[in-house]
Structures are given as structure tokens and as C-alpha cells.
UniProtKB/Swiss-Prot annotation:
The organism's place on the tree of life at top rank: Bacteria
Residues holding ATP: 649-656
Gene Ontology CC terms: cytosol
Name listed for the protein in its UniProt record: DNA mismatch repair protein MutS
Sorted UniProt keywords: ATP-binding, DNA damage, DNA repair, DNA-binding, Nucleotide-binding
Source species: Paracidovorax citrulli (strain AAC00-1)
Lineage of the organism: Bacteria, Pseudomonadati, Pseudomonadota, Betaproteobacteria, Burkholderiales
Family the entry assigns: Belongs to the DNA mismatch repair MutS family.
Length: 890
């Protein structure tokens, strides 16, 4: 593609470049207007509407040309500089916006709002909206199954953080507070599309955010905002204004000053991008760490909940679960999956609702009929948000009207006994006035945009009907006029016609020009014809064109009136959207449970994970798809007496699959889904921690072993007796002795101190001795058997430790050359013989001498009592002198 003029080596200075004065008087009037608008959006690409194109200038043009592969050119001069520009057609705006947003860019849309020629100078323009990755509302830019989430992070004193986030299309502000160390877990949970934070954060906090970005936890654009926007008092006032309340007590959000500060910046930024108040934001939800089951970033990654280890959307647990008929249902189902609650109330309610949809208590079940009814339902949630923001398109209103009618039918046809389903049924009833307004106001097949006309239904407005009548009778008038003029002039091929450039005219070929009457006035000369206008035709033209313009203006005004009337229905429409989404998600859970043969879990008050015939849901589905055989189910029994399994066995035997399936079954049960097992009984769970796999983090200069130890340390600090911990091959990233020693220490700590439910897979057979020395640990292994020179993996979890590893057999299956295998067999025999002749084995699990336990030095004790963010300069200096005195010998 032609890239236009190459300006890379001879760039003209941008008028907005640093150091250039803000005086634009030397520029042309058009460029003065552009530069004044651009000054308000220095870090944003400004799409400046000029006729049928959106133009970009100078640095914006160069950047857009590079990112979008569009032509970069120069046209004319302004203030003595060539005007560097690039443009895109207005009708292709959404396509280019989508590409830029996916690249993490933000775009300000500048439209012509004044009438051309109405005033001296350039037509009036203004920025009508700013499109950023975290504030998307356009259905063309948003994926059906994902939210565009904006997150504001406020760094507070004493290593605390305030978090506030929202999806503009949902209209709910979420609040949370956490420590600096917990920010990564919260970001992984929220999955933001854009993060804003204060320009006044400390260097260390900035480095932490960048580290999260480089590590893949934070994979979205970061935007700095002025420090003054993060004001707690301002945030509290803004929240009260949105809620129309005098107190935040009803939402349990009154004592969250740090989160209030984040919400101040969040709401200001969101309003700035939409160009108006967010009137549809009607709720605040406070999220607390102790309410949710913790799923750290490593857990989400290793369990492949929504993304595979290769970064693909499927096959994952969510891709297997999601058979929803609507985008709303898919998004809600993902939220249930990624935000399971420790309290079982919601999970029990979903299981009970699913049971009725399945027909477990008698009857045929209603899930199939409901899924058929939900097919083709529009995205009410996003349409409602666009109504509130006055951005909704006519065809979206038609789709909304049809969906509301369908929702009424669903509610009328089903009478559920389950409380959750009964509540959903009640919310499906939208106000009758809303449906009547939509049906009466909008044509069944309207134009795509209001500016094109053809949107308001006939009979809705008498004045519009009259104006349309004038336009609709144009053809009759023109035909009658043509007939009369032919008779009057005796010109047989005379034609009365219309085009957008010249309006109405009478066309006469050159051979009949001698018959032209005196009242014909020449309008245009063609090669073989002349075009004329008469006083009568001119009068009709004025009337018809005036009617067309007035009708279009009337339609625009009426459309705005319809939006005004719809505002009162936004809360009810929001409830209807939530009800449709919940019903869709529950039907998907019902369908999956029946299709895949899953069972309903049971919840217990005492600590336990009891699974009979458990299967890995994704692996089982893949085996079924590829006809690769049946999945081998396994049992798991962890309780107060058995808290740890030491898992040994060959590679490819299924250790990792078994561990993951236990975690996935626990997660599915906790979200309120049936589970892939014959029976499941689950006690309280507060977190799922995993350390699986090995890979260098080159971006952060961390080796495989460093990554391994970092994740292990995080688990050892965070896990509790109610946590599920998966440890796979810990210690393999270093030498054998170091790895074995560390693995034994970690296993002992998890057993003796943490007391978490632990699945500990290892190739260190020495670790199997732990079960003999520790009452709450047991040995299990994945079965394998030899058949001649071959090995058969049974994929069964069997009691006791493995007898051998079969590593050389696995190497042969992988295609390692025969000479290498022969050498390995010889070396293995020699090593085993030497081991048998060696000294008595070291006791890995003997407690270390008390004297070896490091104490806390006076300097360390003093450091623990210092909170840098809360110190004044004088206090910091005093603390430094105190540390120096403590560090001096003697």
C-alpha cells in the first residue's frame, strides 16, 4: 500500500510540540480551531471531522499513518509550516477505531456541530466523545463476551491502596481496599482494559505496576492522571450524587477513604470520555478480600480458566462452560467463574435454580425451551447504557423492543417455584409504557443513523407526517407537470427530473430547443441537451426541499424526545438485562451438567475435599472431541486427618492433570455449578494456590528457579488451613541436593504450619518418607505398568509411593535416539548401584537445631516499625540516625 510522503527524516515541528508557544494566531483559522481543540487532548489522537473524512494532523497524522497503514501527506501551509495530515472516511470510522483501541490507543472524536455557512470562519466543531480501551460503549468495538473495564488505583499511606472500577455499560461502581502486595491479585481478578493512577505515586509503586505489566498480569494501557483528582472527599460526594443518597451506609461503603479517592478519578475520567454525566450508574458494590475465594494470577494462568498457556481463548474451562445464547449471559458466567465467594449462599441458590431448570424435582425441565427463546435476544445491558448516554442507534431500539416482548413471553410462560428463578421472572417485566413507546415511535426497519432520516414511525407525529406527505407526492407532481409541459410545448422527449446537485429541472434535447417557451430559464447546459427551470417548478422545489430539511430536523428532534422519555425506564431496563443474563447463565449450567454428565456438589461445614470419580472437564471434552478414548476418573479424599497427598509417578502419567482436576472441581462447586464427578463433598475454601510448570521471566530478569521460589514464597505466606495448594515438581530448577532440600522444607512447612489441603507432586522419591513421619500426609502415585519394553500409563491414582519413574521409557516415546537411551540405561544402573552401596540416607524431615533459627536483629526490628509514607522529613532523618546507631558494633 502507498504510504504517501516519507517524513521520517525531514519532519516538520508540530505546533503542539514541547517548547512551542500556545499562541496559534499565525495559523489559518481552520488550524487555529484544530490546535485549540487538540490542546485539550495532548495524549489522544484527535479525529477532526472535515466533510466526509476524519482528518489527523502533524504528530497525530504520523502516528495514525504508522499504526493504520494509511497515507501520510502534506497539503498547503499554516504558520509557514506544511500541514502534515492523514485521514479516514467517516463511514469507516468504527473499523479504524477498533484497530486503534486494540493497540491500546485513545481517540477523541471531533464533530461538526454548527451549520456550514452559518457563521464567518470555520464551521463550529467540538469533541463529542473520547474512546479509550476502558470506556467503550459501542457494540462494534466491544467483544460480546468481555467487558471493557476501567480501573483506578490510588496509592495510600502505610502500603495501602484504594481501588475503584466500572464498566460504563454496566453502570455499577466497584470499590475495594488492599495492600500493595495484593494489587496484582486484584488486577488479575478485575481484568481491566485500562488503568488510571496518580502522577504522584512513589517510584517504588510505579515500578510495581510496571513489573505487573511486564509479567503479563497487567496487559492493558496505563494512564497518568493529576494527583488532585484522587480526592477522597470528592469521591464520596460523587458517589452520593450518582446514587441520589445522603449516606453510603446502605452500601457499606462509608469507611473506604482510599477507595473513595480512586472513585473520584474514576468517575471524572469516565464522564470526560463520554462527554456527559453517567446518569445510569445506580449502584455501588464493595468487594472485600475475605469475601472471595482468592485466585492469584498464577492460579488463573496454570488452571487455564479463560486463557490457555499459549494465550488462546480455547480450550479453557470458560470456553467449555460457556454455551450461553447471549453476550450478557456469557459475561455474567465469566464473573461467576472468576469471583467465587467463600460464603456458599449464592452457590447453593444457583444449584437450586439449575435443579429446577433441569427438572430434577419432577417435570421435563425448562432449560431447552428457554435457550430457544433466548436465541437472538439483543444485548439489553449495553443498549440500556447507550440510551442513558444518548448514544443509542435506531436499530438498537428496534432490537430492544423485540427483546422486551420476548422477555414478557418468557415470564408469562414459566411459573418457577425456586426463589432465584421467581425473582428473575419478576424482573423480566419491563414497564409497558417503555415497550409501547418503542413500538410506536420507531420504524420496524429504520435507517442506521438518525442523520439519514427514515427513523420515526408514521403516525407518531402529525407535523412529520405532513412534511413526509409533501415529499411523497413529489413524483405525482413531477409526472403531472411533465405531461402538461409536453402538451404545451409539443416536445415529445421532455423530462422533468431531480438530482442532489442541481435540484429539480426540465431537460430538453438540442433538437427541440426552438420550441422552448419564454418562461423557461436555463439552469445547466449539457453536450446534447439543456436543463431549465420554470417559476412553477422553482416554487415547488423550494417547498419540497424545505419539507425535506424540516422533516429531517423534526426527526432528529423527535428522536431526542424519545431518548428523554426512555431515561425514566433505564433502571427497569437494567434489571431486565440482569435477569436475562442470569437466566441465560443458569440455563448454560443446566445444559452443561446434563450434556457432560456432571453431579451436584454438596457443601459441608467441616474441612474436607471428597471427590469420587473426578474428571478433568477440559481434558475429558478434548478426548471426546478427538475420539482418543475415555477419561480415567480418580478419587480424592482430603479432610482433617489427611491434609496432604505426596504424588509420585512417571512423567505423562497424569499427575498434573489429576492435581488440576481437583482444583477445577473445587472452583466449579464454589461458583454454583455441577461438577465432573460421581460425587463431591466440599468444605470451606478461601483460596486456590498453584505452583505448576517452569518458565523463565526474561523481561524481569528472573530465572526458572527464581520464578519457582517466588511463587512458592507467595503461597507459603498466603495459604491458610482452608486453602487448596497445588505444588508440582518444586525444586527442580536447581541442583538435585538443593532442590530436594527445599522441596522437603516446603512440604514440611505446608504440613506442619500452614496445614492447607496440599497436592504435592514430585520426582524426589525421598519425599515419600514424609508420610511416615507426619500423621496428616499420605503417599499416592499414578499407575503405570510395563509390557515388554513398553510402558502403559494407567492414569489412575493409587495408594502408596511409585516404585520407579520410567523416565527413560518416556524419553523413548518422545523419539530420543537409541544410542542416547542405551547410554542412559547404563548410567542409571551405575547410579542405582552406587546409591545402594552408599551411606545411610539423611533424614530430610528431622527438625533443624533451634540455634539455627535466625533471630531478628535490632536493625530489622526498628525497620519493621517504620512506615516511610507517613514520615515527615524530620522524622525520616531521625529514623536514619537511629538505624545507624543500632548498626554500629558494640
Amino acid at each position: 500500500m502507498d504510504k504517501g510522503i516519507n517524513l521520517q527524516n525531514d519532519k516538520e515541528p508540530s505546533p503542539m510540540a514541547e517548547g512551542n508557544p500556545a499562541d496559534f494566531s499565525a495559523h489559518t483559522p481552520m488550524m487555529q480551531q484544530y490546535l485549540a481543540l487538540k490542546a485539550g487532548y495532548p495524549d489522544t489522537l484527535v479525529f477532526y471531522r472535515m466533510g466526509d473524512f476524519y482528518e489527523l494532523f502533524w504528530a497525530d497524522a504520523e502516528k495514525a499513518a504508522r499504526l493504520l497503514d494509511i497515507t501520510l501527506t502534506q497539503r498547503g501551509q499554516s504558520a509557514g509550516q506544511p500541514v502534515v495530515m492523514a485521514g479516514v472516511p467517516f463511514h469507516a470510522l468504527e473499523n479504524y477505531l477498533g484497530r486503534l483501541i486494540r493497540m491500546g490507543e485513545s481517540v477523541a472524536i471531533c464533530e461538526q456541530v454548527g451549520e456550514v455557512g452559518a457563521a464567518k470562519g470555520p464551521v463550529e466543531r467540538k469533541v463529542v466523545r473520547v474512546v479509550t480501551p476502558g470506556t467503550l460503549t459501542d457494540s462494534e468495538l466491544l467483544p460480546d463476551k468481555a467487558e471493557s473495564m476501567l480501573l483506578a488505583v490510588h496509592q495510600a499511606p502505610r502500603a495501602r491502596c484504594g481501588l475503584a472500577w466500572l464498566s460504563v455499560t454496566q453502570g455499577v461502581v466497584h470499590l475495594a481496599e488492599c495492600t500493595h502486595d495484593e494489587v496484582g491479585t486484584w488486577i488479575a481478578r478485575i481484568g481491566p482494559s485500562e488503568v488510571i493512577y496518580s502522577a504522584g505515586v512513589t517510584e517504588r509503586f510505579e515500578q510495581q505496576l510496571q513489573a505487573l505489566r511486564q509479567g503479563g498480569v497487567l496487559s492493558c494501557p496505563l494512564s497518568l492522571r493529576p494527583d488532585w483528582q484522587f480526592d477522597g472527599a470528592l469521591g464520596a460526594r460523587k458517589l452520593l450524587e450518582q446514587l441520589g443518597a445522603a449516606s453510603l451506609n446502605a452500601w457499606d461503603a462509608q469507611d473506604l477513604a482510599h477507595a473513595h479517592a480512586a472513585s473520584a478519578a474514576l468517575l471524572s475520567y469516565a464522564e470526560h470520555t463520554q462527554g456527559r454525566a453517567l446518569t445510569h450508574i445506580h449502584a455501588v458494590r464493595v468487594q472485600k478480600n475475605d469475601e472471595l475465594i482468592a485466585l492469584p494470577p498464577a492460579t488463573r494462568r496454570n488452571l487455564e480458566l479463560t486463557r490457555t498457556l499459549r494465550g488462546e481463548d480455547a480450550p479453557t474451562l470458560f470456553s467449555l462452560l460457556d454455551t450461553c445464547m447471549t453476550g450478557m449471559g456469557s459475561r455474567l458466567l465469566k464473573t461467576w467463574l472468576l469471583e467465587p465467594r467463600r460464603d456458599r449462599t449464592e452457590a447453593r441458590a444457583r444449584l437450586a435454580a439449575t435443579a429446577e431448570l433441569r427438572g430434577d424435582h419432577g417435570g421435563t425441565g425448562s432449560w431447552q425451551a428457554l435457550r430457544a427463546a433466548l436465541r437472538g435476544v439483543s444485548d439489553v445491558e449495553r443498549i440500556t447504557a447507550r440510551i442513558a448516554l444518548r448514544q443509542v442507534r435506531p436499530r438498537e431500539l428496534v432490537a430492544l423492543c423485540k427483546t422486551l416482548h420476548k422477555a414478557e413471553q418468557i415470564a408469562a410462560e414459566h411459573r418457577w417455584q425456586d426463589p432465584l428463578l421467581a425473582g428473575i421472572s419478576g424482573d423480566l417485566h419491563a414497564p409497558p409504557a417503555c415497550g409501547a413507546l418503542l413500538a410506536g415511535a420507531i420504524l420496524e426497519e429504520p435507517s442506521a443513523l438518525v442523520r439519514d432520516g427514515g427513523v420515526i414511525a408514521d403516525g407518531f407525529d402529525a407535523e412529520l407526517d405532513e412534511l413526509r406527505g409533501i415529499q411523497n407526492h413529489c413524483d405525482d407532481f413531477l409526472l403531472a407537470l411533465e405531461t402538461r409541459e409536453k402538451a404545451r410545448t409539443l416536445i415529445p422527449n421532455l423530462r422533468v427530473q431531480f438530482n442532489k446537485v442541481h435540484g429539480f429541472y426540465i431537460e430538453v434535447t438540442s433538437s427541440y430547443l426552438d420550441r422552448i417557451p419564454d418562461d423557461y430559464r436555463r439552469r445547466q447546459t449539457l453536450k446534447n441537451a439543456e436543463r431549465f427551470i420554470t417559476p412553477e417548478l422553482k416554487a415547488f422545489e423550494d417547498k419540497a426541499l424545505s419539507a425535506q430539511e424540516r422533516a429531517l430536523a423534526r426527526e432528529k428532534w423527535l428522536y431526542e424526545q424519545v431518548l428523554d422519555q426512555l431515561q425514566q425506564h433505564v433502571p427497569a431496563l437494567t434489571r431486565a438485562a440482569q435477569a436475562i443474563a442470569a437466566l441465560d447463565a443458569l440455563c448454560a449450567l443446566a445444559e452443561r451438567s446434563l450434556t457432560l454428565g456432571w453431579c451436584a456438589p454438596q457443601f459441608a461445614a467441616e474441612p474436607c475435599i471428597e471427590i469420587e470419580g473426578g474428571r478433568h472437564p477440559v481434558v475429558e471434552a478434548r478426548l471426546a472431541e478427538t475420539s482418543a478414548g475415555a477419561f480415567i476418573p480418580n478419587h480424592t479424599r482430603l479432610n482433617a486427618n489427611t491434609r496432604m497427598q505426596i504424588i509420585t509417578g512417571p512423567n505423562m502419567g497424569g499427575k498434573s492433570t489429576y492435581m488440576r482436576q481437583v482444583a477445577l472441581i473445587v472452583l466449579l462447586a464454589s461458583m454454583g455449578s455441577h461438577v465432573p464427578a460421581a460425587h463431591c463433598r466440599l468444605g470451606p475454601i478461601d483460596a486456590i494456590h498453584t505452583r505448576i510448570g517452569a518458565a523463565d521471566d526474561l523481561a524481569n530478569a528472573q530465572s526458572t528457579f527464581m520464578m519457582e521460589m517466588t511463587e512458592a514464597a507467595q503461597i507459603l505466606h498466603a495459604a491458610t488451613p482452608h486453602s487448596l495448594v497445588l505444588m508440582d515438581e518444586i525444586g527442580r530448577g536447581t541442583s538435585t541436593f538443593d532442590g530436594l532440600a527445599l522441596a522437603s522444607g516446603i512440604a514440611t512447612h505446608l504440613h506442619d504450619r500452614t496445614r492447607a489441603f496440599t497436592l504435592f507432586a514430585t520426582h524426589y522419591f525421598e519425599l515419600t518418607e514424609l508420610a511416615a513421619r507426619h500423621a496428616h500426609a499420605v503417599n499416592v502415585h499414578v499407575g503405570a505398568t510395563e509390557s515388554g519394553s513398553d510402558i502403559v500409563f494407567l492414569h489412575e491414582i493409587q495408594p502408596g509411593p511409585a516404585s520407579r519413574s520410567y523416565g527413560i521409557h518416556v524419553a523413548r516415546l518422545a523419539g530420543v535416539p537409541a544410542p542416547v537411551l542405551n547410554h542412559a540405561r547404563h548410567a542409571l544402573s551405575a547410579l542405582e548401584e552406587r546409591a545402594n552401596e552408599g551411606e545411610t540416607q539423611v533424614d530430610l524431615f528431622a527438625p533443624p537445631p533451634e540455634s539455627e533459627a535466625p533471630g531478628i536483629s535490632p536493625v530489622e526490628a526498628a525497620l519493621q516499625g517504620i512506615h516511610p509514607d507517613s514520615l515527615s522529613p524530620r522524622e525520616a532523618l531521625d529514623a536514619l540516625y537511629q538505624l545507624k546507631r543500632l548498626a554500629q558494633p558494640g
